[in-house]
């Protein structure tokens, strides 16, 4: 089993839960690891660097695969909010290794009258090693032979978001 994948399984749910409670909001985060570092990318800044547009599925697939290659990442985690048909809100976390291992977790969260997150279920025992919550995770670690113009765009985008990517040494 990949060290970075196991590290993300062990640490990412609690780190992300703490971030949600600190900021009182569920923001999409993409985290990726090599064998020594964990990197956090908060996608909320994408409208500022992407012509007013957020990060759609196609851009997420391209950019995550670009980052995986650039950082030699061996595992990627993704967390964001989802809402069920019955309006139950939950955080969906997916972790995928370059070898295709998947781990997924759902945690219910509650908000107050101002839509600020007040609580996130701390029970991390309900996980699944089978199917990701967000199917886009299945596109991570796919080889993409980027055309020159797409690669130039991704390099430019990377230079703009690079200062915002947080780097954390893996805990021993």
Protein language model features and the residues they cover:
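Low-complexity intrinsically disordered segments
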Residues: 60-172
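N-terminal domain-onset segments
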Residues: 1-58
């Amino acid at each position: 089993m990949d060290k970075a994948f196991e590290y993300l399984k062990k640490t990412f749910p609690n780190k992300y839960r703490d971030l949600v409670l600190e900021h009182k909001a569920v923001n999409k985060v993409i985290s990726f690891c090599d064998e020594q570092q964990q990197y956090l990318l908060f996608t909320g800044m994408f409208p500022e660097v992407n012509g007013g547009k957020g990060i759609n599925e196609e851009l997420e697939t391209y950019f995550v695969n670009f980052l995986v290659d650039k950082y030699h990442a061996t595992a990627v985690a993704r967390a964001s909010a989802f809402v069920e048909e019955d309006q139950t809100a939950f955080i969906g976390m997916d972790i995928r290794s370059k070898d295709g291992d998947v781990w997924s977790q759902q945690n219910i969260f509650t908000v107050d009258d101002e839509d600020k997150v007040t609580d996130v279920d701390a029970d991390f025992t309900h996980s699944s090693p089978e199917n990701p919550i967000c199917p886009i995770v299945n596109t991570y670690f796919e080889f993409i032979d980027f055309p020159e113009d797409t690669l130039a765009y991704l390099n430019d985008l990377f230079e703009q978001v690079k200062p915002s990517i947080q780097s954390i040494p893996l805990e021993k």
